[in-house]
Amino acid sequence: MNTIKQSFSTSKLEGYTKQLPSPAPGICLPAGKVVPHTTFEVIEKYNVLDDIIKPLSNQPIFEGPSGVKWFDIKEKENEHREYRIYFIKENSIYSFDTKSKQTRSSQVDARLFSVMVTSKPLFIADIGIGVGMPQMKKILKM
């Protein structure tokens, strides 16, 4: 995970000459903060990763369903190198624990706080962005 964060935060914004939006790509936000569309636009149009990052096992750590509209990755509190991946699909909300490999879901009237349409891998583009997390944690009781 640290390799991914490092690659994303040091990647080049090839061709971008304007002042970076606030928050800039790669900056972690407190839970509940909405990421402005301008930040997503910079990621979509200018972010270039120099390296392909693969898991040590050379296998995907998680295969999600198709049609995922949003997700976020959070490191579990007081636990190092354990992460939970949250995502929304249609009217369901899911969490995937990278240690236990367990997926939990709950039916909800899912509301997206931010929507990003990107040709880049969403896994890379969405690191550390806490959009709508308090509501998700309450629903999943985490």
From Swiss-Prot:
<dbReference type="InterPro" id="IPR015943">
    <property type="entry name" value="WD40/YVTN_repeat-like_dom_sf"/>
</dbReference>
<dbReference type="InterPro" id="IPR001627">
    <property type="entry name" value="Semap_dom"/>
</dbReference>
<protein>
    <recommendedName>
        <fullName>Semaphorin-like protein VACWR164</fullName>
    </recommendedName>
</protein>
<feature type="domain" description="Sema">
    <location>
        <begin position="1"/>
        <end position="142"/>
    </location>
</feature>
<comment type="similarity">
    <text>Belongs to the semaphorin family.</text>
</comment>
<dbReference type="InterPro" id="IPR036352">
    <property type="entry name" value="Semap_dom_sf"/>
</dbReference>
